[in-house]
Every structure is written in C-alpha cells, then in structure tokens.
Amino acid sequence: MSNFFKKLVKKDGTPKSSRKSKSESPVGKYDMNGNQVVPDTASSYSDDSNSLSDSYDKRGEPNIGEQIDTLDDYNFGNEIGDAESAPEDKKSLWKKVGGLVGKDPMSLVSLPVYFFEPLTVLECQLEPLRFVELIEKASTCSDSIDRLMYLTAFNIAVFSSYTRTAKPFNPLLGETFEYIDKQGRYKSFCEQVSHHPPIGIAQTTSEIFDLQQESWITTKFWGNSLDVFSHGQNHLYLNSTGEHFTWKVPSAICHNIIFGKMWIEHYGDLIVENHNTGEKAIINFQKSGWFEGTQRKVQGEILDSKGNARVHINGKWDKYVKAKKHSEGPSRKSSGEITLWEATIEPPENFNKWKHGKWIQGLNEMSKEYQAVLPSTDSRVRMDRIYLEREENKLANKEKNKIEEREREKRKTRESRKEIWKPNYFSKREDSKYGYRWDFNGKYWDERDKRVDSVVDKFKNDPNFDSNKIPEYDDSKLNISVKSVRKFSRDFTNSSTPTQLKRSFSKLKLEEQPQSQSLPPMIKEELSSSTVDHEETFYSESNEAKLESIKEDANSHTYIYSSPTIGHSGR
C-alpha cells in the first residue's frame, strides 16, 4: 500500500478521520443596531427551528455508505497550516492527490479553503441571470427562429462567467438560497436536494418566463487537469408563447491544477431545443489549438423542424455572439451578420480578489434587516463562506471542517435509522419524455412572507429598522386566487392561451394570496382550494396543453385544453 493510502486507514483497514472540531466560531447574525450576535456556531445550522438539523434529520436519505470512498475522511487542510494560504511547494500537494487520478475528487476529499471562492454552488447556479436581458429579448420576437437565436446567445454568454478557477463551496443537504432581482424582474429559489450525487435545483419565476436549472456535476482528475461533466436538465418556458425550451451544456477542463497557471476550457456541443416547434440549435465549443485565435471559439447552426440550417452562429463565449440568417428559399441566401451579444467590460476596480464583479458580489449582499428574515439554511449565512469572504482563512477552514463533520454524523444517524431524506421544496417524479422532472411546491415563498411579516411587526417601532432593505418581489402579476375564479370565469371565455388567462387573473383585486401556482404550461401538480360552498381543482398531465375554451353552467365550469388533456373543474 502506498504511503498516501496508509494515511487514510487505520491498522484494521477502516478509514480514519483527521477532521477534529477544536473551537467554536461566531455566527454571522446582527441585531438591529448592527452589533454582531455571538451564540454557539451550531445554532446557525442545528438549533434553529428552520435549521438543517431540525428540518432534515427526521427525514433521512438513501443509504450511500457503499458509495463513499475512504478518501472522504481525508483532509488536506490540517496538514497545510490550516490552509491559511496556498502552499509554496505544489509538489507537496501532488503527493497528496496523486492517488486520485481517474477518480472524482470533488466527492471524495475535503479541500483546503485556499481552493475556494466565497460562493456556494447554489449561488453560482444563478449566474446565468446576469444575461436575463437575452431571455427578455427572445420573448419579444414574433418569429420562433429569432426566439431560439437569442436563447442560444443567452446560453453561450453564461460561459463568460466560467473563467474563474476558484471552487465554490459544496452546498449542504437541504441548504437553500434565495435571490430577488434588484429591478424586480424575477425571483429565484435554490435547494440542495441530493448529496450523493450532489444535485441542486434553482427555480426562477418572472412575468416573462419560468426557468428551472438542475446542477448535477461530476468530475474526473487526471493529474494536472480536471474534467467537469454536467448532467443536469434545464427547462425554460416563455409565458408570451407557451413555448418550452431545454438545453444541454458542453463539458469543461480545468488545466494546470498542480503545475503552471490554472485556466478553464469549455468544449463539446451546446444543444438548445424548442419542443413546441421542433427547432434546434447545435453549437460547438471548440477545443483550444496551438494558435490563440482558436481559443474560446464557438460556431454552429440553428435548424428548423425539417433539419434545414436557418441561422449560422459564431463567436467567442467570453466576448461576443454573432448570427447570420439564411433564407428559406432555394437560393439559401444569407443576410448580413448581426451581433446578438457582446460582453460588457467592467472596470478593474469593480472586482474583488476572486474576480467577482458587482453583480456576483451582489449575490452575498445582506443588510441586517434582510439577514433577519433569511432562514438559517441560506448560503449567505454559512460561516465558512463568511470567514473566507473576510479573508480569515484559518477560521474559514476550521468552520468548514466542523460543518462537514456535523453533516457526516447526521448522515450516519439517518442511515442507522433507515430514514429516507426528502427535500422540503422540490419533489422528483418520473416523466416519459425527459426521464424525470423536479416539481417546486412554492412553499418557500409562503414561509418567507410569514418571516417578513413577523420581523417587520417586531421592529416596527425601531427607528434603526428599515423594511425597505428587505428585497421584495411583486407577486400580484403571478399569483391567482382560486376561490375567486367562479364569479368572474365568464370574463375569460375568449382567452385562447394560458398566458392570456394568467394576465386576466393578474388584473383582479385578489381577496387572498394562496400558494403561487403557475397556469399551463407550467402547471405541475394538483392544486385544490375549498370554501364552505365552493371547491376547485387543477388536474395536470402535460406541460404542453393549451387552453381552448371555458364552459359554465349553474353548478360548475370547465376549462377545455387541447390534447393531451388538462381538465379544470369547479363545483
């Protein structure tokens, strides 16, 4: 057995752990005067009623004991000066990771914090929303090829964020993150729904679109490089047309991890598909060659439902995306080239040491008022992340080790009790077309509303409390009042699409705000609401149905949808 693996096991062959919790650290909470509150660290994730411990330990997760390599208990940080800074001699690091060749090190080892940036994977999932204007532009296009063209540009532009080489923190099981756009255009919620494999789901809702992103990444270590493979699904619905888009993203390689200057390369095919029209974009991210001109280059075609090339796409994923349209006729003449997207250059002073610009830095912004309403599961309040952001690396590394040790103990407890852990806000179901889908139950935003009301009421007489510093999203344009449908259902008999119906609802003065529920094509589960004399139910079997008409008699009304059928009846 090599010296490396001897360090990982005891004499009896069982894995040994080098992680030890030696000290407690303050929690990043503040009172309304801006003074830091210093309870025991564990309360941040264990003692609160909304904490990971109380919310998730009772639920358990699938038995994964056999999936954990002995390397799971090996910690580099303790042998590198508590990871205060990167080791000068990278050869010493190679001695520790050399045995990982061909393995997935991200799931097998605990890395020191000098490898990290003060973000979690959940936060990074929302970085594509930096380019939300391209989705909004697509929604205004009258031609489906044009819509696909701008959504393709959106999916290329997002890679301009992925040049940083620092690693985000892995979310804990059940960890969450919320984000509300400062311009009020959308709201997003993320939850870590699985630990092995690591899967996080992000659900973004706006008046213009609904987007669900699944982060599911595996890696393979090759000595001085790391392959990164993405397996997650991405679903986008444009509310103006009811169109459903999905995409698959290319792979990546992180070069020169041990020796040389680290850099990231994306390669392979990006495929964006419109499931309503059958149109598809196939864009190739080219591998770098010997010459600089080939670096970060992309090119490909947008195809119509018959497989004919309609648009040629080219560019560099970190700089620009251009398009040249082909005519539909026999001549196949091309139009002039247009620029779909061009990177905005931020001034150097906008960036921090991790190369985060203003938008990315905004993901971690939280006033004391905002922090008061965040749940203890939110990525912003993780103390290892906070300490790293403050550049207190020694404390960050100790806190990270404590959190990981606590999570392993909770996992072992669940396994011993044979408990099955379930996410709080998403549920997984089988899907005949996509294999599976994740359904968002909307409860997080209801819980948040209650927290906001409670905090605002508690500090309403405090002159230092400014409720305007708590981000809010105007849900009136999204929510519907189920109990009020019957008395105004006749107003919608001419509605021809779910979007028109949705907009009609949004103009009403609602009597109450029930759980936010999107109308088709985003209906995902049964929703029922009842009063003393009235009951209504949504039934959903498809995401592609369109509203055809509404029929009503003295006792009931029925919404008629195109095949495959979705029925909605009330009595």
Swiss-Prot record:
Keywords: Coiled coil. GO terms for molecular function: sterol binding. GO terms for cellular component: cytosol; membrane. It comes from Dictyostelium discoideum (Social amoeba). Belongs to the OSBP family. It holds the Pfam family Oxysterol_BP. Residues 1-73 are annotated as: Disordered. Residues 43-54 have a biased composition (Low complexity). Residues 387-420 form a coiled coil. Residues 33-42 have a biased composition (Polar residues). InterPro entries: OSBP_sf, Oxysterol-bd. This is Oxysterol-binding protein 11. The gene is osbK.
